[in-house]
C-alpha cells in the first residue's frame, strides 16, 4: 500500500494529523518567543587598565604590550585591538568564530586567569585591571530619569530603588545604571596653614589612605570560643574624618584634620560620562532580558511594575523610555505577521483563480497546515519569531505549494483520463514522491551555507535556513499524505477543471501556444542557446551598474550624530559644546527626543549598536524622529548645517542598520612602527578621499597630536633635598586638580576622598615653578623651581592604536547616506588609488569597514558552498542515474543572473547581502523545477514515446505546475518588496525566478535535445 493510498483509506489518522498540525501550530505560535532581530553572540571582551601619570607611549610599552602578549597565547583569539592613551589602556579581544556562546564563559575565565597571573609583573603604578566579558549584553529597555530640582545623588537614590524592584521581575536578566556621577568628599587642605605648622602633606595623605583599609586583626580563643578582633577607629562619618588626629612635627601638639582642612560633600568635578535627555541631565537605567523569554510579555510586566511604582516616585522626577525593545518587537512582529498573512492570502487567491476552486482550497489548506507545522518545529528548537524567521516563512510560501501543485495537477490529469480518485492519487504520488523529495532537498541545500556559516552574519541570518528547512521538508510530507487525502474529500471524479476535451487535457490555447513556441526553439536550438548566452553576457556587464550594499539602514526612525572635539579637549569643555549642539538639534521639527552621551557611548541597547570607548573629546547624540521619512529630511538638514553652525567640533551622521556593521564604512588600516610615517601615509590616503565628492566624515583614529607641559626635573638637586620625581608629580597633581586618597564608608555607599588645595591656592600654568613642595632633608616647604630647570611645551601622541600587536593607524570615511551612492561604490573608486601609493618597507595598507565585513560574511558562506553544490549535483545524478541529464538543468543555473541583474536595475535596488542570499537560493528553486520537468521527460521516454514528442509533451504537461510554482513564489514575495531589509532579496528572487521559469520550460528541453542529439520527428 502506497503512502497516498494509506492516507486516503486511514481517514482517522489523516484527520488526527491535521488536528495536531492545526492546534499545535496555533499553540506554538502563541508560545513562540518574540524578538525584533535574532540574537547573535558578540564574541568580544574588553580589558581596561589604568596607569595614572603614564604617557600614552609608556602605557603602550609597559602595560598594553605585556597584556597583549599574554592574551595572544590563548588559542581562541581571532584579533586584538587596543588603544593606549594617557594613563589608560583599553584592549578589545575578539574570539574566533568557531566558538559558540556556551564556550565563551570558560574562555573568558581562562583569559582572566592569565591576566591575573601577569598582574604582579606589571608596573607598580597600575591601579586597576578590569575585564569586561559582558560587553555584548543588550539592554533592551532603556529608561531615562531626569529632574530639574534633583541632583545626581537624589536621582541615583531613586534609580537604585527602581533597580531593586525591576531585578525581581520574571524574565529580567540584569539591571544596570549609567550616567550617575560619583559622590565624593572634598578635603581642601591649605598649604599655607601646613607650612605654618610645618606639616608634611604626605603624612596627611598617608593617614587618609590607611585609616579605612580593611585589614584582619586576627582572632583569639576565649573559653573554647573563637572571637574575632575588630579595632575601632573606622571613619564612617564626616565628623569622624574632621576629627582625625594629625601629629605636629615641631610642637608635638595633636592637630585635627579640621584645623588645616575644609571638608565638603559633593559630586566629582571631572566626570567620566555624562548623559543628557531632551536638554536635562539624566541617569540611565538599562534592563536586559533573560535568554529565551518572550520579550513582549516581559516588557508588559516591566510596564506594569513601573506603573505600580508610580506612587512612590518623587514629585518632579520624570521617567522616559529611550528605547523599548518590547514595543519595537511587538510592532515589528505584528507588521511581519500581517505581511505573512498577506502573502498567504495572495498565494491562495492565485491558486483559486488558476487551479479552480476545489484545487485551490486543497493546496491552500495544505499550505496553512505546513505553516502551522513549521511553528511547532520552531517552538521545539527555540527559534523565536523575528524579522529573519518570519521573512524566511514569507520566502518559503511560494515554494511550499510547489509539491502540492504537482500532486494536485497529477490527480486532475488522472481524473480527466478516467481514473478513480484513489488511483489517480496513488499513481502521481508513486511517480513523483522521490523526484519531489530530491528537488526539496536540493532547495533546502541551496540555503545551507547560510545556516552553516559561523561568522556573526551567519549567526544573525542562520534561522533563515532552519525555518526554510523545516517548512520545505514538511511541504513534501504534506504533499504526499494530506494532499491526496484532501483531494479524495474535495475533488470529483471526471472533474472538468482542466479542459472540455476529456481525452487530451492540454488542448487549451495556452498549452497550444506554448507548444508552438517550444517547437520553434527546438528547431532553432543553437540560436536559442546563443541568445541566452548573449543575454548572460549582457547581464554580467549590466551587473556592474547595480549598486552594492552590505546591510541596509534599519526601519527604526533613529540616527546618531557623533561629535569630536579637538583631541586634548577637557570633557567639561566637551560637555559645554555638546549642550549647545543638543539644544540646536532639539529645536528642529519632527523630533521625538534627543539624548546625548558625553565621554563614551551609551549602554548597548541593540545588538547592532556598538558603544564607543572612553574619549574625553567625544559625544554622541541619539536622535529619534516622529517617522522614517522625516528622519531623512532632518539628516539632510543637519548634514549641511551642523558644520556651518559649530566650527570647533567635527560631526559624523550615522543611521541605525540591520545586522552586524562596522563603525565606519571605509577603513584603510596603515600598519608600521613609526608614528610619523603612519601619519604621513594617512595624509596621502585622506587626500585621495577628499578628492572624491561622495566621501564624508574623513578622519583617522590617532586624532590630532596634543601638547604637554614638561617640567625639567633636576635629579641631582632634588636628591640632595630628599625629593623624588614621584614627590614632584604628586605635589603637582595636588596643586592643579587634587588626588583621590582613601575612602569613607557610609553604609553601603563608599565615598572616595579627594584631597586638594583650596581654590584660592590652586596654581595655573604660569606659576607652576612656584608650587611649594615638602623637602624631607630641610623639613620644610621649598618652591619647585629649586628642583626644576624650567618648563617646556612638547607634543605627544594622545592615542596609540594597535591591531594584533602592531601599531595601526586607520583612516576612516563614510559614503553620503542621503545620496544614491553606496559604500561599495566609494570603495571601488578609492581603493585602487590608495593601493597605488608608494609604501615604505615595513609598512602595509589593508582594508576593513564594510568591505571586510562583507568579505568575511561571504567567506563564511563560501566555506560550505562547494560542499553544498556538490551534494546538490550528486542528488540530481542519483535521481536520474545519469551524468548527462543533470547537466541539462545545471546549465540553466548561471542564466538566472539575467533576470536578477535587470530586475535590480529596473527597481534601482542594491545588491545587498540579503540579495546575495536570494541569488544562492535561486539555484535550488531552478533545479527543483528542472527536476520536475526532467522526470516527466524520463517517464515519457520510458513509455516508448518518440524522444522529440516526449520532450514537447513533457514540457507542455509541466507548464501549469512549473509556472504556478513560480507565480505563487513571485506574488508571495510582494509584501517583502517594501521591507527595508528583505526588499532587495525579494526583487532578486522575483526577477530571477520569473526568468528562470522560461529557462525551465524552454532552455531545459532545448539543452536536453542538444546533449542527447534528438531531432524533430519525421512525421
Question: Model regions: which residues?
Answer:
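Solvent-exposed, non-transmembrane alpha-helical starts
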Residues: 16, 55-62, 99-110, 140-144, ...
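Signature of alpha-helical transmembrane segments and their immediate interfacial
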Residues: 1-34, 430-432, 500-551, 596, ...
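Transmembrane helices with small-residue packing motifs
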Residues: 12, 19-54, 116-123, 450-459, ...
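Helix-loop junctions and hydrophobic alpha-helical segments within the transmembrane domains
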Residues: 322, 329, 333, 408, ...
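Transmembrane alpha-helices and their membrane-interface boundaries in multi-pass membrane transporters
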Residues: 380, 397-411, 432-452, 459-501, ...
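Solvent-exposed, membrane-proximal periplasmic/extracellular interface segments of envelope transport
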Residues: 22, 58-134, 192-213, 232-234, ...
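Hydrophobic transmembrane alpha-helices and their membrane-interface caps
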Residues: 24-31, 345-413, 871-958, 963-982, ...
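Extracytoplasmic/periplasmic membrane-proximal domains and adjacent transmembrane bundles
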Residues: 6, 119, 165-345, 408, ...
Amino acid at each position: 500500500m502506497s503512502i497516498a493510498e494509506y492516507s486516503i483509506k486511514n481517514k482517522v489518522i489523516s484527520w488526527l494529523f491535521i488536528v495536531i498540525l492545526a492546534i499545535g501550530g496555533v499553540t506554538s505560535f502563541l508560545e513562540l518567543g518574540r524578538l525584533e532581530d535574532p540574537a547573535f553572540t558578540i564574541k568580544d571582551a574588553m580589558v581596561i587598565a589604568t596607569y595614572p601619570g603614564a604617557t600614552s607611549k609608556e602605557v603602550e610599552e609597559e602595560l598594553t604590550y605585556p597584556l597583549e602578549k599574554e592574551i595572544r597565547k590563548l588559542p581562541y583569539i581571532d584579533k586584538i585591538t587596543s588603544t593606549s592613551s594617557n594613563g589608560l589602556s583599553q584592549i578589545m579581544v575578539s574570539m574566533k568564530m568557531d566558538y559558540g556562546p556556551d564556550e565563551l564563559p570558560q574562555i573568558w575565565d581562562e583569559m582572566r586567569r592569565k591576566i591575573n597571573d601577569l598582574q604582579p609583573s606589571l608596573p607598580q603604578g597600575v591601579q586597576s585591571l578590569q575585564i569586561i566579558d559582558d560587553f555584548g549584553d543588550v539592554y533592551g529597555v532603556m529608561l531615562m530619569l531626569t529632574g530639574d530640582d534633583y541632583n545626581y545623588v537624589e536621582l541615583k537614590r531613586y534609580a537604585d530603588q527602581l533597580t531593586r524592584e525591576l531585578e525581581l521581575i520574571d524574565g529580567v536578566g540584569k539591571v544596570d545604571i549609567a550616567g550617575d556621577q560619583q559622590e565624593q568628599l572634598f578635603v581642601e587642605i591649605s598649604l599655607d596653614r601646613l607650612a605654618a605648622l610645618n606639616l608634611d602633606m604626605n603624612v596627611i595623605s598617608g593617614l587618609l589612605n590607611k585609616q579605612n583599609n580593611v585589614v584582619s586583626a586576627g582572632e583569639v580563643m576565649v573559653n573554647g570560643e573563637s572571637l574575632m578582633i575588630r579595632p575601632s577607629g573606622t571613619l564612617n562619618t564626616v565628623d569622624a574624618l574632621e576629627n582625625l588626629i594629625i601629629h605636629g612635627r615641631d610642637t608635638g601638639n595633636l592637630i585635627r584634620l579640621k584645623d588645616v582642612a575644609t571638608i565638603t560633600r559633593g559630586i566629582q568635578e571631572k566626570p567620566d560620562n555624562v548623559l543628557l535627555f531632551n536638554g536635562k541631565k539624566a541617569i540611565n537605567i538599562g534592563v536586559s532580558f533573560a535568554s529565551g523569554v518572550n520579550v513582549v510579555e516581559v516588557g508588559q510586566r516591566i510596564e506594569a511594575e513601573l506603573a505600580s511604582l508610580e506612587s512612590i516616585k518623587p514629585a518632579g522626577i520624570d521617567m522616559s523610555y529611550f528605547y523599548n525593545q518590547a514595543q519595537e518587537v511587538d510592532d515589528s512582529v505584528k507588521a511581519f505577521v500581517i505581511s505573512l498573512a498577506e502573502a498567504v492570502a495572495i498565494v491562495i487567491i492565485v491558486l483559486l483563480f488558476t487551479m479552480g476552486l476545489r484545487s485551490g482550497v486543497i493546496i491552500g489548506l495544505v499550505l496553512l497546515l505546513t505553516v502551522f507545522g513549521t511553528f511547532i518545529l520552531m517552538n521545539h528548537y527555540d527559534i523565536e519569531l523575528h524579522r529573519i524567521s518570519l521573512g524566511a516563512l514569507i520566502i518559503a510560501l511560494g515554494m511550499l505549494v510547489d509539491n502540492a501543485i504537482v500532486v494536485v495537477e497529477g490527480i486532475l490529469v488522472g481524473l480527466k483520463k478516467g481514473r478513480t480518485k484513489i488511483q489517480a492519487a496513488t499513481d502521481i504520488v508513486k511517480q513523483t514522491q522521490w523526484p519531489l523529495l530530491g528537488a526539496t532537498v536540493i532547495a533546502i541545500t541551496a540555503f545551507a551555507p547560510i545556516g552553516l556559516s559561523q561568522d556573526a552574519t551567519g549567526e544573525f541570518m542562520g534561522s533563515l535556513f532552519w525555518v526554510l528547512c523545516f517548512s520545505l521538508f514538511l511541504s513534501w510530507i504534506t504533499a504526499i499524505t494530506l494532499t491526496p487525502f484532501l483531494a479524495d474529500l474535495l475533488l470529483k471524479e471526471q472533474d472538468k477543471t482542466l479542459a472540455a476535451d476529456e481525452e487530451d487535457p492540454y488542448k487549451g490555447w495556452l498549452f497550444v501556444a506554448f507548444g508552438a513556441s517550444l517547437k520553434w526553439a527546438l528547431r532553432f536550438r543553437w540560436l536559442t542557446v546563443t541568445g541566452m548566452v548573449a543575454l548572460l553576457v549582457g547581464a554580467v556587464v549590466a551587473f556592474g551598474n547595480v549598486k552594492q550594499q552590505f546591510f541596509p539602514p534599519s526601519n527604526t526612525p533613529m540616527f546618531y550624530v557623533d561629535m569630536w572635539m579637538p583631541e586634548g579637549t577637557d570633557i567639561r569643555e566637551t560637555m559645554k559644546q555638546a549642550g549647545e549642539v543638543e539644544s540646536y538639534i532639539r529645536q528642529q521639527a519632527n523630533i521625538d527626543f534627543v539624548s546625548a552621551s558625553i565621554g563614551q557611548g551609551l549602554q548597548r541597547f541593540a545588538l547592532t549598536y556598538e558603544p564607543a570607548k572612553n574619549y574625553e573629546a567625544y559625544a554622541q547624540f541619539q536622535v529619534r524622529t516622529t517617522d522614517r521619512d522625516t528622519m531623512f529630511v532632518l539628516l539632510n538638514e543637519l548634514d549641511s548645517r551642523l558644520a556651518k553652525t559649530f566650527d570647533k567640533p567635527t560631526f559624523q551622521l550615522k543611521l541605525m542598520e540591520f545586522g552586524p556593521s562596522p563603525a565606519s564604512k571605509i577603513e584603510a588600516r596603515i600598519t608600521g612602527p613609526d608614528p610619523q610615517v603612519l601619519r604621513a601615509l594617512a595624509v596621502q590616503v585622506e587626500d585621495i578621499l577628499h578628492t572624491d565628492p561622495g566621501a564624508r566624515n574623513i578622519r583617522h583614529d590617532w586624532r590630532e597630536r596634543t601638547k604637554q607641559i614638561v617640567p625639567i626635573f633636576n635629579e641631582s638637586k632634588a636628591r640632595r633635598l630628599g625629593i623624588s620625581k614621584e614627590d614632584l608629580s604628586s605635589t603637582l597633581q595636588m596643586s592643579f586638580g587634587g588626588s583621590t586618597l582613601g575612602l569613607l564608608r557610609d553604609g553601603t555607599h563608599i565615598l572616595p576622598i579627594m584631597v586638594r588645595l583650596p581654590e584660592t591656592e590652586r596654581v595655573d600654568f604660569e606659576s607652576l615653578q612656584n608650587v611649594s613642595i615638602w623637602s624631607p632633608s630641610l623639613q620644610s616647604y621649598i618652591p619647585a623651581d629649586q628642583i626644576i630647570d624650567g618648563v617646556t611645551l612638547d607634543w605627544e601622541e594622545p592615542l596609540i592604536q594597535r591591531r594584533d600587536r602592531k601599531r595601526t593607524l586607520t583612516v576612516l570615511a563614510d559614503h553620503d547616506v542621503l545620496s544614491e551612492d553606496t559604500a561599495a561604490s566609494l570603495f571601488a573608486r578609492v581603493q585602487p588609488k590608495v593601493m597605488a601609493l608608494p609604501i615604505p618597507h615595513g609598512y602595509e595598507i589593508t582594508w576593513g569597514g564594510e568591505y571586510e565585513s562583507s568579505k568575511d560574511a561571504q567567506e563564511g558562506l563560501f566555506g560550505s558552498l562547494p560542499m553544498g553544490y556538490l551534494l546538490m549535483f550528486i542528488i540530481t545524478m542519483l535521481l536520474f542515474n545519469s551524468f548527462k541529464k543533470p547537466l541539462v538543468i545545471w546549465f540553466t543555473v548561471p542564466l538566472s543572473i539575467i533576470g536578477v541583474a535587470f530586475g535590480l536595475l529596473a527597481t534601482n535596488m542594491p545588491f545587498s547581502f540579503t540579495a546575495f542570499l536570494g541569488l544562492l537560493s535561486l539555484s535550488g528553486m531552478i533545479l527543483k523545477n528542472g527536476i520536475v520537468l526532467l522526470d516527466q521527460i524520463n517517464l515519457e521516454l520510458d513509455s516508448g514515446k518518440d524522444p522529440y514528442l516526449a520532450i514537447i509533451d513533457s514540457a507542455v504537461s509541466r507548464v501549469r505546475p512549473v509556472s504556478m510554482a513560480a507565480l505563487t513564489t513571485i506574488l508571495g514575495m510582494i509584501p517583502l518588496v517594501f521591507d527595508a531589509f528583505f526588499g532587495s532579496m525579494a526583487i532578486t528572487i522575483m526577477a530571477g525566478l520569473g526568468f528562470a521559469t522560461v529557462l525551465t520550460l524552454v532552455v531545459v528541453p532545448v539543452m536536453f535535445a542538444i546533449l542527447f542529439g534528438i531531432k524533430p520527428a519525421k512525421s
